[in-house]
Each structure stands twice: as C-alpha cells, then as structure tokens.
Amino acid sequence: MPLSASEGLCVLVADDEAPARQRIIDLLRRDSQVGAIIEASDGLSAVEIIQNRRPDLVFLDVQMPERTGLEVIAEVGAERMPLTVFVTAYDEHAIRAFEANALD
C-alpha cells in the first residue's frame, strides 16, 4: 500500500542491471519526498511488488528478464499501474513504450 504523505513516496526501481538501478536509487535518496525505495532485478519481481506493495512511482526498465517492462504493464493492468517512468537506452524500446501510452 502506498505510504502516507508524511512517510514519503514509495518508489520501485526495476532494472536488471545493478549499476543502472543504483544510479536511480542514488538520485532518489537525495529527494526528501521519497520515503521507501524498493528494488527489483527482473520483470516478474516487479509485477509481484506492484501488486503487493502498490508503490506510488515506478522506474521500469523496458528490457528485463522474466517480463519486459511492457509485459509488466500488461500483466498488472494499465489502469492499476502506478505512475511509471520507463528506463531504456534504445530508441526502439522508447517507441514501443509510447505506443503503450507512456508519456514523454
């Protein structure tokens, strides 16, 4: 369940590459509005965390093992998905994310 405003935002960082996850986490730790940071290293773990913990914000790698970022959204359901920031180094993945209703 999302944290109350007094506890700060609960943020999920889902990326299969540990250095990429750590860079995002380091940036989030500087923000006083962020309370809890949860990590996932694959898409299946991301789905389970989203369904069970209901984070307020998700940083989601497009290309991960077990489930891609787009498959995570499809499995959770776009209407139940928290605000999501797609993380990708590939233009092709960004295009597919926008086709899945991601915002620029």
Regions found by a protein language model. Give the residues of each.
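Basic, polyanion-interacting recognition surfaces, primarily
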Residues: 1-2, 19
